[in-house]
From Swiss-Prot:
Domain of life assignment: Bacteria
Disulfide bonding pattern of the chain: none
Protein name, as recorded: Nucleoid-associated protein SO_2177
Family under the similarity heading: Belongs to the YejK family.
Source organism phylogeny: Bacteria, Pseudomonadati, Pseudomonadota, Gammaproteobacteria, Alteromonadales
Cellular component aspect of the GO annotation: bacterial nucleoid; cytoplasm
Length: 342
């Protein structure tokens, strides 16, 4: 296993016959058996691999809008040993119930909370899971419908880096959370119940890094091939950091580039007007533009590796055209068939 589970528990928030939300609290933690280990391992992998996560911190009531300090205070008591895990998670469930009650769309769900260790960091994982209906075949070959937790489609989840929280009280990124689809913050209520305030604009930082890299290679004496190697190296480094759940460190990245013969990136990035933080989380979807060009519009979708620009792919901005040399075999086959049919 890539994680070491300390404790885990599930509480249920559901609607009663009058449509009121109620908490059904589990009286003891889940036993750390195979089922729990497999579930949390899967959730850990799924959550870690999700790109586009947001990052924040516990807001201070009054200074950061209407941030609710109740969750942070309960967590502090739990970490200090003044509150048991069951009591802490029970309080959290009731806080979530109160927040959900403000919205008409909520149906509740199963609140999973778990403390575990991964890569020498302690985490508190918080997720509101939903049940999904499925069919199974019984021993007598009859079909039966049952419900199971939908672990592959988690949309309401957050993870608190307890190690970073303890080491750096001024950090603004020790809480990560899943953003809503298409950039919509559909999970605002989930962050509100924890009193989480967004602290780092991850996409903006990654976009700025990408711009700094492009400006760096443009101002250098590198050949075209060396420039693409630089972009590829940046993407490779950032991808590794993303997969490890670690931050991009500008100094560390500059050292990686220096090892490849590309000196002075750190001074270039810090000396300009880029306003890059020394450390920030990686966003693969943004940085992928270092390796690929892609775009969609008017019923046309184009995607190709950056190294092909100027060789197999010729762009003429004056005529607003793209020429592709060596059409992919499967596309060529489709086009030839269509021409013959016409």
């Amino acid at each position: 296993m890539s994680i070491n589970i300390e404790q885990a528990i599930i509480h249920e928030i559901s609607q009663d016959s009058q449509g009121q939300l109620r908490c059904r609290l589990r009286p003891q933690p889940l036993l750390n058996g195979q089922a729990v280990e497999m579930m949390l391992e899967e959730l850990h992998q799924t959550y870690t691999s999700k790109s586009g996560k947001g990052f924040g911190y516990f807001g201070i009531h009054g200074d950061d809008g209407e941030a609710n300090p109740a969750f942070a205070n309960a967590l502090k008591e739990y970490r200090a040993g003044d509150l048991g895990f069951v009591e802490f998670t029970g309080q959290a469930s009731k806080l979530l119930q109160e927040e959900l009650a403000k919205y008409d769309f909520s149906q509740g769900g199963f609140l999973l909370m778990s403390c575990y260790t991964s890569m020498a960091s302690d985490y508190l994982f918080v997720a509101l899971l939903s049940a999904k209906s499925s069919m199974t075949v019984l021993d007598d070959m009859e079909l039966s419908q049952n419900n199971h937790l939908d672990l592959n489609n988690i949309q309401l989840a957050a993870r608190i880096d307890l190690t970073e929280l303890q080491a750096d009280k001024d950090s603004r990124k020790y809480i990560s959370f899943i953003r809503g689809r298409a950039g919509r913050k559909v999970a605002d209520f989930f962050l509100d119940f924890m009193g989480c305030v967004e602290g780092v604009n991850t996409k903006a930082q990654n976009k700025t890094l990408m711009n700094a890299v492009e400006d760096f290679v443009a101002s250098s004496d590198l050949t075209k091939e060396e420039r693409q190697q630089c972009r590829n190296k940046v993407f490779e480094y950032c991808s590794e950091r993303f997969d490890e759940g670690a931050d991009i460190e500008i100094k560390d990245l500059a050292d990686e580039l220096a090892d490849q013969g590309m000196e002075s990136f750190y001074d270039f990035a810090r000396g300009g007007s880029y306003e890059l933080d020394e450390e920030f989380p990686a966003d693969k979807s943004t940085l992928r533009q270092l390796k690929k060009f892609s775009g969609t519009g008017g019923g046309v979708t184009i995607s190709f590796d950056g190294g092909h620009l100027g060789q197999r792919v010729i762009y003429d901005p004056i005529s607003d055209t793209i020429l592709i040399k060596g059409v992919p075999a499967n596309l060529k086959d489709q086009l030839d068939r269509r021409l013959k049919g016409e």
